[in-house]
Amino acid sequence: MSTSKAITLTLFITTTLLASCDAAANATTKPLFPAILIFGDSTVDTGNNNYPLPTIFRAEHFPYGMDLPDGKANGRFSNGKLISDIIATKLNIKEFIPPFLQPNLSDQDILTGVCFASAGAGYDDLTSLSTQAIRVSEQPNMFKSYIARLKGIVGDKKAMEIINNAFVVVSAGPNDFILNYYDIPSRRLEYPFISGYQDFILKRLENFVRELYSLGVRNVLVGGLPPMGCLPIHMTAKFRNIFRFCLEHHNKDSVLYNEKLQKLLPQIEASLPGSKFLYADVYNPMMEMIQNPSKYGFKETKRGCCGTGFLETSFMCNVFSPVCQNRSEFMFFDSIHPSEATYNVIGNRLDPLIRGKFQA
């Protein structure tokens, strides 16, 4: 073979290999969904409560957000990313999900999805009466405004295509039980047994996701309850002993609720053509972290990183609060909300389940 032919063949093979690598890379990085849409409470609120709302449940002040790239608080109740941001990143949609009430949203923000969640919200409207958050039942109204803007950008047909194929995260529930049943028993007269209140909440959840379906949503991840008896603030409020053991009867309530939710979601899916619903288990990963903290790099699971870690959250966790040096060693950032390290563990668990369900 002549030298010129050898060079030509080498260049051809090299070009082909590079093209194959580029194609493989594009296949790997291509988003599984065109957009991500978030509904719920403070576990997924990326900053809606920063904007004109008469609520004290805000996180636009230090030390919240201290481990974000710019080190600035932006409304996320953690030291860094929330679980919704982590999911969006793993799905190659975007790094951070902006709140819908943010006034300077770009068209690209709208095209790839936003957050409608509000810290302090719950499925029970009574929850937001005390927190002044945007009720979960009100969040579809924000979604309708989003759809209108999306249609203005890409037209009606393309907008509904994006909505139909978007990935939707719904995360709420703990506020309902803590505020209306455990700490302030306002619902106990109506529901003397916790199972009755659970059924009420699950019916509210079902009505909510059915409304989202009527607006075009098809792919939904629904979060279960965490081990509520292990939340630092809850252990403080129900103080039993100096060792701060989890409140097992409240954890059992979480388990029962989650079992009911896991049975409900397939029933909803079967009744809504073209829909896919996936249960997000946060209870078991969190219990594993509590029971075997060193496996996940944690040294503290019974209190938050901010202040004493027993009570501080929202306005009580502020610029004057001492903050732990190694946030990755704390399971909770404040007395309620997980640290970014915890959300990363949960995100790693959920990612293959999401791909398995929605790529099928």
Swiss-Prot record:
Annotated compartments: Secreted
Active site positions: S42 (nucleophile), D334, H337
GO-annotated cellular components: extracellular region
Enzyme class: hydrolase
PANTHER family the record matches: GDSL ESTERASE/LIPASE EXL3, SGNH HYDROLASE-TYPE ESTERASE DOMAIN-CONTAINING PROTEIN
Species per Swiss-Prot/TrEMBL record: Arabidopsis thaliana
Glycosylation, residue list: N26, N104, N326
EC number: 3.1.1.-
An annotated Gene Ontology molecular function: hydrolase activity, acting on ester bonds
Gene Ontology biological process terms from the UniProt entry: lipid catabolic process
UniProt record similarity statement: Belongs to the 'GDSL' lipolytic enzyme family.
Protein name per its UniProtKB record: GDSL esterase/lipase At2g31550
Keyword vocabulary terms for this entry: Glycoprotein, Hydrolase, Lipid degradation, Lipid metabolism, Secreted, Signal
UniProt KW Signal keyword: yes
